[in-house]
Amino acid sequence: MKMKYFHHPSGLLPRLLLLLLLTMGAVACTKEDNPDQPTSDEVATVKMSLDDVEMRGGDLYSGEDLIKKVRIFVFREGLNGLWVLDKQKLFASGQSDFQNPFTISAHAGPRQIYVIANEPDALTTKLDKILFKKELEDMQAPDVNEPIVRPFTMTGMATATLNPQGTVQANISLNRIAAKITLDIKQVTPGSDVIKITKVQILRNAKNSRLLEGTNKPTGYWNWANACDLPLTNNGSAQSIIQASAPLYVYENIGSDSDSSGRATQLVVEALYNGIKTRYYAYVNDKTTTANHHYSIRRNHHYKLDGTITKMGEFSSLLLTTTVLPWTVENLDYGFLVPYVAEINPHAVITQDNVVTFENSLSFTVRIKGRDGSRWKATLDNGLEFGFDSGSAIDGAADGTTVYTIKVKALKPNGIGIQRRTNLFFTVDGKKVILDKNINPQPTDIKIIQQGL
């Protein structure tokens, strides 16, 4: 007799049956193997706090990056060490529960928790169908043939033991899937040599990457090129080719010294040296750096390239220094500037609760300093009950010299027994402005209240 098989059109049926068997096995073994653990058929709640994520004007940000979606996976260990899905949930901007920390309920017991922020739209359907941790670990981010653009996908992981007797708190640090590259070049040559940069390339940027951080090598590459007409000044200041305000964002490219010749990311500079065409080559993050991952690029890091042309030639005539920094580290020598208030009047608005009413606004003047050419923006974190009064500046040049007047008012009449609060802060390039560098901890928010009647 010929056997008949039922084929589910989604291909999920065999995986669902396997998941059911593994889950039943995990439940049966829980008390026998771990008598002190809460039973896994009990429901518990965990609050996931995303580090360095804050609400600004009703939106969630991690540093300068806007977060629009957060997906949480909770996995439990099944038979033979296979981690299976216990619960997953997608949080989206605009929903009432889209706030940090995020709350999710799952079954009690030891759990591994993964967070995906700003998931690519192309992966949403695949992520919806995840049943095993291995599927998530193997998932590839979308292929690219050009720089990665914001909003960046971010991922993080934590472990926690969920207990039905109380809400468990867990913290997760998010890592961006991208790395960033900046490049400055200067000339230090004998005599009166004249050099003009005509083209710069960053070769062998990874075309693909795992969604989660891993050790896999790229299977394809793309090249970045920028034609330019940039004269250098001998023994003068460096010229920014890839500026700090507009870095090159790429996937991680992980490997080793042994495979560097066909895989490692490479810098190529084309120039006219006293009118003669020449070309310079150098590996990004080679053995001369102090990093622990030579010839590789890792996600959530900043690769600051400083090149010095010393003479005509190819490899040895371009001295390239790669400084590897965490994404959020500021380097003041490189022109990164933590924005700050150059002057605020009256200064007391920084240190006190500033009272406003429906009729009378808070008014003060401010000068803000950021990097050259940058602009500041003012934000109230309670825009439903407070706003900027007429004549108030809400953005401006962060040049440190222009004086702006800020006016904040209450949008509603004073209520009986109702106290309303908001924080006012300024940002430059997504970074909060420090109000006074001499106060520890350095303040960034101005507190404003409306008293109740």
UniProtKB/Swiss-Prot annotation:
Its main location: other. Disulfide bonds: none annotated. It comes from the Bacteria. One of its GO terms (molecular function) is host cell extracellular matrix binding. PROSITE patterns: PROKAR_LIPOPROTEIN. GO terms for biological process: cell-cell adhesion. It is found in: Fimbrium; Cell outer membrane. The name (major fimbrium subunit) does not indicate the abundance of the protein, but is derived from the greater length of the major fimbriae. In strain ATCC 33277 and strain ATCC BAA-1703 / FDC 381, major fimbriae are 300 - 1600 nM in length and about 5 nm in diameter. In contrast, minor fimbriae are only about 80 - 120 nm long. This length difference is observed only in a small number of strains, including strain ATCC 33277 and strain ATCC BAA-1703 / FDC 381, and is due to a loss of function mutation in FimB, a protein that restricts fimbrial length in other strains. This is Major fimbrium subunit FimC. It comes from Porphyromonas gingivalis (strain ATCC 33277 / DSM 20709 / CIP 103683 / JCM 12257 / NCTC 11834 / 2561). The lineage of its organism: Bacteria, Pseudomonadati, Bacteroidota, Bacteroidia, Bacteroidales.
